[in-house]
Curated annotation (Swiss-Prot):
Function recorded in the entry: Involved in nucleotide metabolism: produces dUMP, the immediate precursor of thymidine nucleotides and decreases the intracellular concentration of dUTP to avoid uracil incorporation into viral DNA.
Membrane-spanning segments: none
Keywords on record: Hydrolase, Magnesium, Metal-binding, Nucleotide metabolism
Name of the molecule in the record: Deoxyuridine 5'-triphosphate nucleotidohydrolase
Top EC class of this enzyme: hydrolase
Record bears the keyword Metal-binding: yes
Signal peptide region: none
Length: 268
């Protein structure tokens, strides 16, 4: 699915091209015309406490279980990568850092993987999730005190022992809005580690055990995520698994445990 920050006044359905004969349906409801490979200026006049902005994309998505939606940017803006759960029924929003008035957003479905092998029991380190959730919450392994502009590398007491599928660490929307940004990072082998930065103007203390990030397991690689940038930009086609879109009217999204709470990820 390629979309900038646009959408359609009618509801639309997407059928993904899967490895199996069965088709999966993605429901999309949005309020303005779709703009493919284009962009429009979104203005938000309600910044968060550290100046980060919530930018509503005029888009609602209902994904099947086993999928998530990735919200990213094209170009050199300052949009945090966002993960939207299959169970989210609210309006999708992007979190944008101050200092750049224009951004082009890119939304695409991700196929989630069932699991990976680790040297210690997986749930000794990562929190369990519901079937409709995208990622496993990551509790902070120790207290972190981040001064303005300060960053720390977080290393979890777990090693990956297989090469099946792909694993990525993403931030949480609620912390992003406070200026606490996780560098999206692949976990390829060895220990799980990632950087977290305070881009706000005030010191922040993250308590031991506080949820600071999420681990997302995917069936396709996201090669543009390297762990070196807090705001990585996606190329034109981030997925090998490409959805084929069919447009229709009057689809009703199934109910979910998550509903419209939060930003669409495990961020709230």
């Amino acid at each position: 699915m390629e979309e900038s920050a646009g959408a359609t006044s009618a509801q639309s359905a997407a059928t993904s091209v899967s490895e199996s004969p069965a088709e999966e349906t993605i429901l999309v409801c949005a309020s303005e015309p779709v703009t493919v490979d284009g962009g429009r200026l979104l203005v938000c006049r309600s910044p968060g406490p550290e100046g980060f902005y919530k930018v509503p994309l005029g888009l609602k998505v209902a994904l099947p279980t086993g999928y998530a939606m990735l919200v990213a940017q094209r170009g050199g803006g300052r949009t945090t990568n966002g993960i939207v759960d299959a169970g989210f029924r609210g309006e999708v929003q992007a979190i944008v850092a101050p200092g750049r008035p224009r951004a082009q957003f890119y939304c695409t479905p991700l196929r989630l993987a069932p699991g990976i092998a680790t040297d210690v029991p997986f749930f000794e380190v990562f929190a369990p999730k519901r079937d409709e959730d995208a990622g496993y919450d990551i509790p902070c392994p120790r207290e972190l005190v981040l001064p303005p502009g300060g960053a720390e590398t977080v290393t979890l007491p777990v090693h990956r022992t297989d090469g099946r599928h792909w694993a990525y660490v993403f931030g949480r929307s609620s912390l992003n809005l406070r200026g606490i940004v996780v560098f999206p990072t692949p976990w390829e082998s060895g220990p799980c580690r990632f950087r977290i930065q305070n881009r706000g103007a005030h010191p922040v203390t993250l308590e031991s055990g506080q949820r600071v990030a999420q681990l997302v397991l995917t069936r396709e690689p996201l090669g543009w995520i390297t762990g070196r940038s807090p705001f990585p930009a996606t190329p034109r086609a981030p997925m090998q698994h490409r959805p084929a879109w069919l447009f229709a009217r009057d689809f009703v999204a199934p109910s979910s445990a998550r509903g419209a709470r939060g930003f669409g990820s495990t961020g709230l």
